[in-house]
Amino acid sequence: MRVVPYGETALYVDLEIDDAGARRERTLAVARALAARLPDADVVVGAGTIAVVGVSGWDDLEATVRDAMRAPPLGQGSRLHEVRVVYDGADLAEVAGAAGLSTSEVIALHAGTTYDVELVGFLPGFAYLAGLDERLVLGRRAAPRPRVPAGSVGIAGPYTGIYPQSSPGGWHLIGRALGVVAFDAERDPPALFQPGDRVRFVPSHVD
C-alpha cells in the first residue's frame, strides 16, 4: 500500500493489488471504513485507489488509513440493479466480428454476467461495471463519436457501462438501457449506481 499527500487537504491511497477481483473488494471495504472514520471528508473510489479530500493532519491520517486497511470484507450487503436493455447498438455487429462471435452470442455473454460497480466517474453517474467476459474485452473505438445518446450501453477494455447523459464517447455501443435514470441532481445520492452495487442486464424488446 502507498499513501501520499494529494495537495494540502487531501491524500491518495494506492492499494497496489494486481488481482482485479481482490482489488475491487478490498478498495470498497477500505473506502467505506475511511468514510466511517472521516465523516466530514469526501472519499472517492478509483480502480484500486482512493482519494480522501477535505482532511488535514498527515500523521493522524496515515494512521487512520492503515487502521482502515484492516476492515473486514463487505459481504453480500450490496444492492442489485436489474436493467432492461434493447441490444440494437450501432457497434453490436462490429463487436461480434472482432470477438469471432455471433451477435446472439455477444448478447448472451453480456447479459449472462452480474457486474460489480467498481467506480463512478468520466460523467456524473457513469458507473464502470467490472466483470465483463474476457471474450468481449476490446480497446476503445479508434474514432470516438461526437455524441453518444443517453442510456447507451457500451463496452471498452474490461468494463461495460451506461451513458447517463448524451456526450462524446469512444466505447463500443451494443444496446440501450430502458427506464434508467443513472444521474439525477435532485436525488440523494444523485448517482443511481454506487461503488459496491451489482448490475444485471436483462435483454428486452420495444413493443
Segments (PLM) and residue ranges:
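Glycine-rich active-site loops that engage anionic ligands at enzyme catalytic sites
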Residues: M1-D207
